[in-house]
Amino acid sequence: PPKPPSPMFATYSPKTQDLLQRLNAFFDQHIYPNEARHHAELDALRRAGDVWQPMALIDELKVKARAAGLWNMFLPHAYKGQGGISNLDYAPLCEVMGRVSWSGEVFNCSAPDTGNMETLERYGTDAQKEQWLEPLLDGRIRSAFLMTEPAVASSDATNIQCSIVRDGDDYVINGTKWWSSGAGDPRCALYIVMGKTDPDG
């Protein structure tokens, strides 16, 4: 079995060892050899003034990652045959993906989508899962996470000022967000907004 990427844990489950072996092989075959191409594609997008446009390389490698069974590895609960590993098991996979900053998207394991998908999988209604989770898991859309606000230190969620008030069958959201991860991506179709439904809480 492959050696763990760090001494953080003494042993990994057989499933994680298998995923680690296949992930390292994928990096050797497809990620490391394409770092120069990724840099060139990103540079071209920068020169064109739109770094958020999808990259041909990433789209090509997504197909290969899915075929290799290295897709949606982050899900802590199995959902329709995907994911089903613990955070402990996912940690060494993150270490490998962290070696190349852009690789997470290749495996549909990049923020903010991962956290948003976990939220939908755990708390979403069946209708929300069908409308948003399924396309996210399939990699057809991207999502954004709106937490940071200009007037408060909102990395501490208790400081958030954005209010969410029930109005009949609707909710009224009132607030200002910025630095909204993922919002610039043209494939972004879902925004998860952090706000307070209880202004005193």
Tell me what each language-model feature is.
Residues 116-120, 146, 189-193:
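Adenylate-forming
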Residues 97, 123-125, 167-169, 196-200:
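Short loop segments at secondary-structure junctions
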Residues 107-127, 156:
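N-terminal glycine-rich flavin-associated loop
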Residues 162-165:
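A structural signal for short hydrophobic beta-strand segments in well-ordered beta-sheet cores
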Residues 170, 174-201:
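A short core secondary-structure module
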Residues 3-110, 127-142:
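Amphipathic, small/basic residue-rich leader segments at the start of a protein or domain
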Residues 151-160:
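Active-site-adjacent elements of ketosynthase-type condensing enzymes
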